[in-house]
């Protein structure tokens, strides 16, 4: 059993949008909810007998959250050091096993598939760590008892479980390219077709995966060993793994079994519901309440339907709300209300934006959420007009937050320089056989690695890998994407900078801002290509390729560093984690490209801008495409009124950060709206996602307030299963579309607007 306290409570981090378990390509904001690691730090040595009428699993959970530690068990206060060795567990002689890598990578496939589906819909992606940890335990633990060792049997402990979850994360976190920059390349006519470009897609994924992976090793040294950053979600994963393997009491075993059962049932239920609902979407999936009221005689209410206000019974975003909390969900909702309930209608009323009539027979039924427009400057659609304020305010908000962390980054740079100089001088003295008496830099002792030397990643392994991946990036960029070597080097430098920012932010607040600040790379690359005077299409391709390299490589480095934190706490071998990350990333490259080709085959609109995409909103794609056009065009293709609004909201967002940090006490930060969430509401036209999220957030809040012990067991497992299940349901739906047995062929239009199929 584990017990601990993390320096980030639900209230303290709730103001961030969903990342570690859930992240957004556009908001870059992660998951704030880490339910199983926040508890009292008092240590008690008392016996706590179970009431015969009480659920043993809840009693176990209550002992975790109340501070009571049953006799003979370990109490842990998380100070960044590895958990103490549990004398009740056997020694793990083998951590890097084929079963851990294969099972972990397959679980990463599930999350990767979910990320492709959900990312194309909203720009959201989800981390695979906790999902891989729990499901990996559920699969391997029973097999370890019944199979011979040669076939995957043998003891399965927490260290190997850490290897499973890092393989899952490595394999499942490479889909960001395919829900943002890559579709944007096709929309701009810069690529041919996914099947024809499959080699280029593979190499682009490879260079973004391995550069970030190798760079995570030195980041571990500084941020995990020396700074001892909290990393809330990876720490939650470590505590979860330890609790799953706690077999000292019947209550602990029952609690672990309940989490597994909840996760499995919610996953299967969500997958089934998503797949079946496409055959009657107007009844089972989308409730177009305002359309129903219109057909019953309330003619004026058709305008609400035109602006996309209806309810979708989406398990994934109900689960996302459970994980994100009230602040993140309501900030998203506030942005949607402002954009699609206030500003948008005012724009249309004043003739600043224009929609497309849906039907001549139904006056007032107009599509306002489409990106299509014949003249983006003089006759923009509301969605195009609102895109720029949304993107700009998120960028301003994120950089304002980073600015307040500038002293920390400067301290990190100085400390890294001092430590490196000390190491080089020490090595030089040893080579010459001289005595080295120079005093160690302040805090240098904290860099001592608790892992034995044979479990540490050799210097040659990550340095050689880093250099090879850098060379590969330049070679692939030049020969396959006509990328200038100077632009390629700049993209690698930006990835380096973004990785530092992302790990620092993720390690302290669980917020990874890379999705937003990657827009800065597009601005930098756009300036370089303009100065070079290269043709427009080459400039656009360079912008998207270099921007995706900087963003995806840095994002992967942040994910890998978080996994190394989980392994550090569990005393897992860093070199075993390292090779698992390489294997998982290698498998993930094939899976990510294959999944994108599958979806592009089923839904041609993903790569053809002329086809209206009713199944996917693609907000991240729209943002990357629009920014690319803007930074490479001779004049900015932004309506003047949209630009003014963007500047005003950007100033307001930055000012909020200043006021929050300088004058508002920390305990009140949870009441301050999250501007990343507000901006997301501008970028994502689907208002039913924040509606589902606030319902999920309120359910989780009420549950945790009234029955915290039950919530600790149920909330995350239920939410994770709902999210992954709908994502896999989306993959199954894509397969059904390809074989022509999907809902758009055999489904019913009952209760859909205009009596046309709405699935």
List each model region and its residues.
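Alpha-helical multipass membrane-protein architecture
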Residues: 2-7, 12, 18-759
């Amino acid at each position: 059993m584990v017990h601990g306290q993390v320096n980030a409570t639900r209230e303290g981090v709730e103001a961030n949008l969903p990342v570690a378990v859930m992240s957004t390509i556009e908001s870059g904001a992660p998951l704030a909810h880490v339910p199983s690691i926040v508890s009292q730090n008092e240590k008690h040595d008392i016996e706590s007998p179970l009431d015969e009428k009480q659920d043993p699993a809840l009693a176990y959970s209550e002992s975790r959250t109340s501070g009571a530690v049953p006799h003979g068990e370990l109490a842990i206060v998380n100070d960044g050091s590895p958990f103490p060795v549990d004398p009740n567990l056997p020694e793990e002689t083998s951590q890097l096993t084929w079963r851990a890598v294969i099972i972990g990578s397959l679980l990463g496939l599930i999350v990767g598939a979910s990320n492709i589906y959900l990312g194309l819909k909203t720009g959201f992606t989800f981390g695979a760590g906790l999902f891989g940890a729990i499901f990996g335990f559920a699969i391997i633990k029973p097999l370890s008892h019944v199979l011979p060792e040669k076939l995957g049997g043998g003891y399965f402990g927490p260290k190997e479980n850490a290897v499973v979850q890092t393989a899952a994360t490595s394999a499942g976190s490479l889909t960001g390219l395919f829900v943002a920059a890559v579709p944007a390349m096709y929309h701009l006519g810069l690529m041919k077709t996914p099947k024809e470009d499959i080699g280029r897609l593979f190499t682009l994924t490879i260079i973004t995966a391995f550069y970030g992976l190798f760079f995570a090793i030195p980041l571990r040294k500084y941020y995990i060993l020396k700074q001892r950053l909290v990393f809330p979600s990876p720490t939650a994963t470590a505590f979860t793994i330890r609790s799953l393997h706690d077999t000292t009491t019947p209550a602990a075993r029952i609690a672990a079994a309940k989490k597994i059962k909840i996760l499995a049932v919610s996953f299967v239920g969500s997958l089934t519901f998503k797949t079946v609902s496409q055959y009657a979407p107007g009844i089972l999936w989308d409730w177009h309440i305002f359309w129903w009221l219109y057909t019953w005689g309330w003619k004026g209410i058709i305008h609400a339907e035109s602006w996309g206000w209806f309810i979708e019974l989406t398990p994934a975003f109900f689960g996302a709300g459970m994980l994100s909390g009230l602040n993140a969900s309501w900030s998203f909702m506030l942005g949607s209300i402002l954009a699609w309930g206030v500003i948008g209608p005012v724009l249309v009323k004043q003739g600043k934006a224009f929609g497309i009539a849906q039907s001549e027979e139904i006056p007032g039924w107009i599509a306002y959420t489409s990106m299509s427009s014949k003249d983006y400057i003089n006759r923009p659609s509301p969605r195009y007009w609102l895109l720029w304020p949304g993107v700009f305010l998120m960028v301003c908000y994120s950089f304002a937050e980073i600015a307040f962390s500038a002293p920390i980054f400067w301290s990190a740079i100085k400390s890294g320089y001092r430590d490196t100089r000390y190491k080089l001088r020490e090595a030089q003295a040893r080579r010459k056989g001289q005595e080295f008496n120079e005093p160690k830099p302040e805090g240098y002792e904290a860099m001592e690695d608790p892992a034995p030397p044979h479990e540490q990643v050799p210097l040659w392994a990550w340095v050689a890998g880093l250099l090879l991946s850098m060379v590969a990036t330049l070679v692939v960029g030049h020969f396959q994407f006509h990328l200038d070597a100077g632009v390629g080097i700049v993209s690698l430098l930006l990835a380096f900078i973004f990785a530092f920012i992302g790990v620092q932010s993720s390690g302290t607040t669980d917020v990874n801002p890379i999705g937003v600040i990657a827009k800065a790379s597009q601005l930098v690359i756009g300036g370089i290509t303009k100065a070079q005077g290269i043709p427009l299409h080459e400039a656009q391709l360079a912008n998207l390729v270099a921007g995706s390299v900087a963003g995806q490589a840095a994002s992967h480095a942040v994910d890998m560093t978080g996994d190394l934190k989980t392994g550090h706490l569990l005393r897992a071998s860093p070199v075993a984690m390292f090779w698992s990350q390489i294997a998982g990333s290698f498998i993930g490259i094939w899976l990510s490209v294959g999944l994108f080709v599958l979806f592009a085959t089923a839904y041609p609109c993903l790569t053809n801008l002329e086809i209206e995409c009713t199944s996917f909103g693609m907000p991240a794609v729209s943002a990357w495409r629009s920014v690319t056009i803007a930074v490479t065009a001779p004049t900015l293709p932004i309506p003047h009124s949209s630009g003014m609004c963007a500047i005003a909201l950007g100033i307001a967002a930055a000012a909020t950060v200043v006021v929050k940090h300088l004058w508002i006490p920390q305990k009140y930060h949870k009441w301050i709206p999250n501007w990343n969430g507000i901006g997301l509401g501008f970028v994502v036209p689907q208002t039913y996602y924040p509606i589902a999220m606030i319902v999920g957030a309120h359910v989780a809040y009420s549950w945790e307030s009234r029955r915290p012990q039950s919530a600790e067991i149920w909330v995350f497992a239920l939410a994770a299963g709902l999210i992954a299940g709908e994502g896999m349901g989306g993959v199954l739906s894509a397969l059904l579309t390809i074989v022509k047995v999907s809902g758009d062929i055999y489904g019913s239009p009952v209760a859909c607007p205009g009596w046309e199929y709405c699935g």
